Amino acid sequence: MSEPRKILVTSALPYANGSIHLGHMLEYIQTDMWVRFQKMRGNQAVYVCADDAHGSAIMLRAEREGITSEQLIDAVRAEHMGDFADFLVDFDNYHSTHSEENRELSSAIYLKLRDAGHIDTRPVTQYFDPEKQMFLADRFIKGTCPKCGTADQYGDNCEACGATYAPTELKDPKSAISGATPVLKESLHYFFKLPDFEAMLKQWTRSGALQESVANKLAEWLDSGLQQWDISRDAPYFGFEIPDAPGKYFYVWLDAPIGYMASFKNLCARRPELDFDAFWGKDSSAELYHFIGKDIVNFHALFWPAMLEGAGYRKPTALNVHGYLTVNGQKMSKSRGTFVKARTYLDHLDPEYLRYYYASKLGRGVEDLDLNLEDFVQKVNSDLVGKVVNIASRCAGFIHKGNAGVLVGADPAPELLAAFREAAPGIAEAYEARDFNRAMREIMALADRANAWIAEQAPWALAKQEGQQDKVQAVCGLGINLFRQLVIFLKPVLPKLAAAAEAFLNVAPLTWADHRTLLANHQLNPFQPLMTRIEPAKVEAMIEASKEDLAAAASQPAGNGELVKEPIAAEIDFDAFAAVDLRIALIEKCEFVEGADKLLRLSLDIGDAKRNVFSGIKSAYPDPSALEGRLTLYVANLAPRKMKFGVSEGMVLAAGPGGEEIYLLSPDSGAKPGQRVK
């Protein structure tokens, strides 16, 4: 028998400045299912995580709420832990990056990098808010685009024309925190010499540690040459002070991944069988996996392994990268009620419904996953209630009525039982490869076979016939054993259902190896309903409650620590407005722009003509194809603008503060391409 594997697993650290939503839960459920499978197989799998608790955003929110940053992150951590626990995510440890373990490790790693010559310093000139007495990151500066003249744009890019620029190029800059006019000020910054590790990273990213598509994307960065990474921020800042630099703090992305190590170290202090160096030492034979979203690949696949290498630690065995969550084929939307917080979901629906649905759609690739709410209801009701639970509910009553609840050990269908046993290695292989959707398909195919066989045997009809009681017990006994097999296969996904089934079956917690055995002459406990069907009305209630969450947030005082209230622009007369030719446009094609961080290329049909537009909305629409076929509003008479990537022939209209919160405007149903907006 082979030795159990030593496996350390992490999920990305959620930021301690907001609630967990269903997009976040995709990753934690995916990771939890994989870890539970490993533990069922007898491996020493350890799952750690923590709140990412540093940065200006946290400091500013705490200030706005009149509490300390520590009080804020403690409250948010408690909220996060409650959400994860109720979604049955079973961390071995859930810590915080604002911990002594993380302070010690961050300082030690920095000093090792410094002593090895991997740290550089140089002066940096940037905007400074004279009222708040703090340097301003790009997102904390707003002003007029130096390229197209659009007001109220961020400090690094224009969402109107897609131009990128330095914050110092912005016209009429204002602090988005205080509204004050910022001044330029010089400060000494600390840099990690990432180019020192270019050769190592080129090898490591092609070593099998990454999905091929991720490795290909990183190759673009590596081939264009790596730049030094700014790892310092000036006071005031909520974080850890750099050991040899008073008033300078580690940038949040330096100490955040070290939080994985810190959480594990915190666990080691409570579990003597765990040795920190056995998992993190340079020559560790343990496996280390990071489950992350595709938006933070660069930090985990470039900066993080370079830091570990430079400080004398091991590198990850692999990064398991997943895509984004969409709902009903579109980006999660607060106004449509599809931006659903974890707690709002839990207030209305069973967490195992979502765990199963995610499992049924999650593959090992980086593709986005769509939560189609109609399909969600149908799939859960059909698969879990109509197939799996149905087997037990069909058979249990006959065993209790006809044999006092004792399950006999007969095997009236050896070929069917053999099919279940023969399927186990393939299902295990799918779990191991994170091909959860394949595992669910194979499990449900077995459930279909079991239900078809039971229907063919018709124990309900046999029970009415003289002399058929032994056959009824044999059929139903095998039915319960097949149900037990399915529960074993589904336990990583449905731990609560599995626990209820174990209570009914009157057995100890099931392991993966238990699929090789059968219950025989075994006393069952009375059967209780294991799962109920999803009522569509409850899904609708969840959507409405999510809209109420938005309304409640909108009723709060304006401002989130990053933005000041946006004033109404200067008054114009009707002729000035009428000069803008707004048209309905059909998005025929939408695609990424090679080499552009923020742009999408939209091919538009405006009725009697085609137009090509570049729009800075990539951060909000990570899957461009989701926009294809949509109608939007288009400025048709804006002068064409020559850009680095081609000519942009007009502009599409969107609302929102930027980043992920950009909302492309759409007309009401019935509008046609080319119609003028009046």
UniProtKB/Swiss-Prot annotation:
Residues of the signal peptide: none
Catalyses which reaction(s): tRNA(Met) + L-methionine + ATP = L-methionyl-tRNA(Met) + AMP + diphosphate
Binding locations of ATP: 334
Chain ranges for the short sequence motif 'KMSKS' region as given in the UniProt record: 331-335
Gene Ontology process terms (BP): methionyl-tRNA aminoacylation
EC number: 6.1.1.10
Keywords, comma-separated and alphabetical: Aminoacyl-tRNA synthetase, ATP-binding, Cytoplasm, Ligase, Metal-binding, Nucleotide-binding, Protein biosynthesis, RNA-binding, tRNA-binding, Zinc
PROSITE patterns xrefs: AA_TRNA_LIGASE_I, TRBD
An annotated GO cellular component: cytosol
Family matches, as CDD domains: Anticodon_Ia_Met, MetRS_core, tRNA_bind_EcMetRS_like
Function: Is required not only for elongation of protein synthesis but also for the initiation of all mRNA translation through initiator tRNA(fMet) aminoacylation.
PANTHER family, sorted: METHIONINE--TRNA LIGASE (PTHR45765), METHIONINE--TRNA LIGASE, CYTOPLASMIC (PTHR45765:SF1)
Subunit comment: Homodimer.
Homology family: Belongs to the class-I aminoacyl-tRNA synthetase family. MetG type 1 subfamily.
Name of the protein described by the UniProt record: Methionine--tRNA ligase
Species the sequence originates in: Pseudomonas aeruginosa (strain UCBPP-PA14)
